[in-house]
A protein has these predicted regions:
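A short, flexible loop at the N-terminus of ABC-type nucleotide-binding domains that lies
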Residues: 1-5, 9-22, 70-72, 94
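The feature captures the beta-strand-to-loop junction immediately N-terminal to the Walker
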Residues: 36-38
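Conserved ABC ATPase signature
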Residues: 134-138, 142
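Conserved ABC ATPase "signature" region
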Residues: 114-129
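ABC ATPase NBD coupling module
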Residues: 67-81, 95, 99, 107
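Hydrophobic anchor residue at the start of the ABC signature
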Residues: 148
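Helix-to-loop junction immediately C-terminal to a conserved catalytic motif
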Residues: 51
Length: 220
């Protein structure tokens, strides 16, 4: 099993309310699990715990059977990536995009050439002229596709999709979903989709589980 989550719970402050309560699920390679719920239900918190943004209060996460420790380090840091609802948070607003896109190469000692990066980005509909711009100069759809390309540079086996299309227009939504489906078919990446959009969950996912009050329901 690619990802196994057991008894995951989270509170943000001592003696504060539990926002995630004993959540358990598993996702295998090539599968997409949707956690579906209203705003404030705790669904984004689950995804952000898995991606290493927040520590869990209780419970454990296993990747290929190995219990993860947080903050994520070494291979696990590459193998688990996240795509945010607001893609601009992925990029430093003061840096040109070429500099932000070079960062994974530096962190993980990957061979870099500008030409190689440009060729890689073409499948995401991003071209060389985009790279000399700042994040605010791209559309939401362009920036989300670039964020996806940046995540996939790390060659992850698991991707958290935290409302990745909710801020996009219909055409951009379709482009991002198509890219995600193609990537999954090619690489057998496992996805956790966090969404309030039931129609998207039904169209895109292997299984759907509702979340209410931090508690995960049975598949629907």
């Amino acid at each position: 099993m690619l990802i196994e989550v057991q008894g995951l719970s989270k509170r943000y402050r001592p003696r504060g309310p539990m926002v995630v309560v004993e959540v358990s699920f598993s996702i295998d390679r090539g599968e997409t699990l949707a956690i579906f719920g209203d705003s404030g239900s705790g669904k984004s918190t689950i995804g952000q715990i898995l991606a290493g943004i927040y520590p869990a209060t209780a419970g454990e996460v296993r990747l290929d059977g190995q219990r993860l420790s947080y903050p994520l380090r070494g291979p696990a840091r590459r193998r688990i990536q996240i795509l945010f609802q607001h893609p601009e948070v992925t990029f430093n607003p003061k840096l040109r995009l070429i500099d932000s896109m070079r960062e994974p190469y530096r962190l993980f000692h990957l061979p870099y050439t500008r030409q190689g990066l440009c060729e890689y980005l073409e499948r995401y509909g991003i071209y060389e002229e985009h790279l000399d711009r700042f994040p605010a100069e791209l559309s939401g759809g362009e920036l989300q596709r670039l964020a996806l390309a940046r995540a996939m540079l790390m060659d992850p086996s698991f991707l958290v999709l935290d409302e990745p299309t909710s801020m996009l227009d219909v055409i951009s939504q379709a482009q991002v979903i198509q890219l995600l489906q193609e990537i999954q078919q090619e690489r057998e990446v496992g996805y956790l989709l966090i969404s309030h959009d039931r129609a998207l969950c039904e169209r895109f996912c292997t299984a759907i589980r509702p979340l209410e009050g931090g508690r995960l329901g049975e598949p629907v």
